[in-house]
Each structure stands twice: as structure tokens, then as C-alpha cells.
Amino acid sequence: MITLKEALKYSKEELENLKKELNEKAKKEKKLGAYIEQFLDKDLSVSGEGVPVAIKDNISVKGWELTSASKILQGYIAPYDASAIVNLKANGFSPFGRCNMDEFAMGSSTASSCYGKTLNPLNFERVPGGSSGGSAAAVAGGLALASLGSDTGGSVRQPAAFCGCVGFKPSYGRVSRYGLASYSSSLDQIGVLTQNVEDAAILYDAIAGYDKMDSTSANIEFIKTVPNLNANKKLKIAVIENYVNDADSEVKNALLKTIDMLKANGHEIVYKNLLDSKFDIAAYYIIATAEASANLSRYDGVRYGKRSENIQNLKEMYVNTRSEGFGEEVKRRILLGTFVLSSGYYDAYYIKAQKARAFIKAKYEEILQDCDLIFMPVTPTTAFKFDTQKSPMQTYLEDVYTISVNLAGLGGISVPVAKDKEGLNISAQLICKAYDEQTLLDGALSLEQMIKN
């Protein structure tokens, strides 16, 4: 598979041939479920001029159906381009194909989609991760040069780690959320999934920057990262020792070897600890579900998508539309979010979760005061088998090392470093100070080149 960097040098005719080739390949690999099948019936080669980039099903592309992999939004056609898509097109890229995802980005396996599950291209019995599992599977499976996803608590980095590609979540506000179907507004961030770190930098440079259409967009000077990429920069890296030690033995051993390589290549390694991850999980699922219960209240059968036909009055329209339209996991999170925001529990849960979030952010800032980057696992295990997570809590624990990065609003990247005995990918996660993506990408490029050599 050619890289984004190589494809940007293609002529218009070469790009058209590439798109036709990718389209045919995607149709042959329908079993993988990386793309939403109904979308493959369209001629994706006419998606516009530019290098093709696959798009997660919660990012608006004008004229495309946007469903967030939910029955309740089927039939909704986006009337405008998301700001990230506007920037994408302005920089020589074109949207190409709708990637499958967990419904409303709520999940870690891409098994809750109303279109059916996505498989892991490394092993069809394993999950691709989520919620951007389709985006990761498309890139890792050779069906896309790169893709856009969204990351609320690890939804770009975790599937990238499970499928064996690079997953990069910029700092909160660095990429506009205008045109992204909201799950949790204070945590959501559009990210990129690519074949390598340089491509991640190229795609990030194309979509990042301040946007007046998004009130949470960071009005901070944005300097392109690609011209300044430097894999030879020597960095001070804080290894989160308690997280590395708590990971599965194969993941732990791979990360320890990676740390030794970083030392051997001249990076300064120091050892730090973060809070017990149970605080991250509690704070994240209270805040995220509270915001989701508010954001998803707009899907009631009045303005968007499907409306139940089995109705006699207004109340039945609301109840039946939402009962029929939302999947089990989405209903679970809406109920939890409504509960923690209720008058009797707001102080006991939501306010305490926000205090915990501030504490988590302060701990990261303390470590990053005298370190350039943080190093830790992306996931505690490699990709798990379908239907082995017996409870929602087991599924939630898959994001244990990624959610705190969103709570703190920092940038994070997942880089493949090893394979386990079954050939499944193991990745390392690097984390930077807010809006210091240049250092993050420099460190990731250094790590990637070390692994290749």
C-alpha cells in the first residue's frame, strides 16, 4: 500500500485509478466490515479530486448519509461539511468511504453498530477495537491509505493498537468539532489513523487549526508539524511504571524492551506513577454519560433520522422512536448519564467526577513540567475475542490507559512496537503537553524508526 506522502505526488489520473482500485478491493473484502456496506454500492471513485481518506460515520460530509452507526439516524443526509472535511479538501484530500463504528462512538469493539460488527484484519476472531474500529481496520487491512476517526476516551488510539496502525489524537480543541456528531462534548476530538507517523503528521496538518464555528476550538497559533519533524531530537520521557507493570505479561515485556531501546537511542528515561486507574474510569464514565444524555436528547423523531411508525400521540413518538432507534449500550449510557445528573445525585456523582478530573489533569501537568513526553501502554491486553467480555465493566476497562488523556485534554499517539505470540499487535502510547504535538510526533517518529531498524 502506498503512503499518503507518496499519493500526494500522484497525478489526477493516477488518483482516479487508485480510488477505483481501493473501491474494488473494499467490495471484495466486505466480510471485514471496515466500510458500511450500503455505501460501497456507490461509486466511491467520484468522491471528488484529491488523495482518498476514509471517514468515520459520525463526521459530516455534505450529501452523505451520517448515522453514527445507529438506526435512529438512518436516512439523515448531512447538509454541510464538517470543518475538518473543509480543511481536508482544501489541502489536496477527498473523503472516500464511510467507516463502521460503535453506535454513537460508545464502545471498544465496533460490535454495537447497527450495520453489524467489524473484524480485525490481523485475526478475524478478534475485535478491531472501538469506537473507530472501521477506520482502523480499513487502514490496517489495506482498504484505505488513511482515515479520520474520533477519540472520546481512546477511540482512535485503542483500535489502532489492536489493528496495528498509527492512531493520533490531538489535544482537545486543536481540530474543530464542528460537524462531528457529539457523544461527550468536553472529551470528543477528531483524530487520524494512518500507516505511519509521518502520514499522521501530514493528515493532522491538513485538518488542524482554529475554527470560529466551534466555541471549544483552541485559538492558539498552529504551526505545521511536517516541515519540522525531527526523529533525532533527544527527549526526556516519563515512563508510567505502575501502568506498565499492570499490563498483561506479553504487553509488559514488549514495552520494557521498547523502553530499553529508547534509552539506547539517547532518550532520557525517568519513572513516574499516575493515580490508580479506578479514579479515571469513574470520572470518565460519569462525565461522558452525563454529556451523552444531554447530547442525545435531540434524537426524538422530530427533526433527525427515523421516526417510529407505531405512535398515537407525542409521548409515544418520543418513547417508541428512542426505544426502537437506540441500541442497548447507548440506552445504558443515557440512563446512567440521566441518573448522575438527577437532583438527588448531581453533587454525589457529577460534581465529584469533575473534581477528580481536575486532579487527574493536575497530575499530568506535574509530570510534564520537567518531562517532554509520557510513555505508557495503550491497552492492558492485545485484541480480545468477540463475545468474551461478559459485562459492560469488562469492556470499559479496555480504555483504562487512554481515558485519562481525554480527561486532561492532552495529545496522545499509539505506535506499533511488537507482536505477541499469536501475531497480534502491541503498541506503545506517547502523551504530550497540551498543544505540543510537534514534540509528540518527533518522539513517535523516533520510536517508529527505532522499531523498524
Swiss-Prot record:
Reactions performed catalytically: L-glutamyl-tRNA(Gln) + L-glutamine + ATP + H2O = L-glutaminyl-tRNA(Gln) + L-glutamate + ADP + phosphate + H(+)
Coiled-coil portions: none
A biological process from GO: translation
EC number: 6.3.5.7
Main enzyme class: ligase
Keyword Protein biosynthesis included in the entry's annotation: yes
Keyword list, A-Z: ATP-binding, Ligase, Nucleotide-binding, Protein biosynthesis
Subunit structure: Heterotrimer of A, B and C subunits.
Family: Belongs to the amidase family. GatA subfamily.
Family matches, as PANTHER family: GLUTAMYL-TRNA(GLN) AMIDOTRANSFERASE SUBUNIT A, TRANSAMIDASE
Protein name: Glutamyl-tRNA(Gln) amidotransferase subunit A
Gene label: gatA
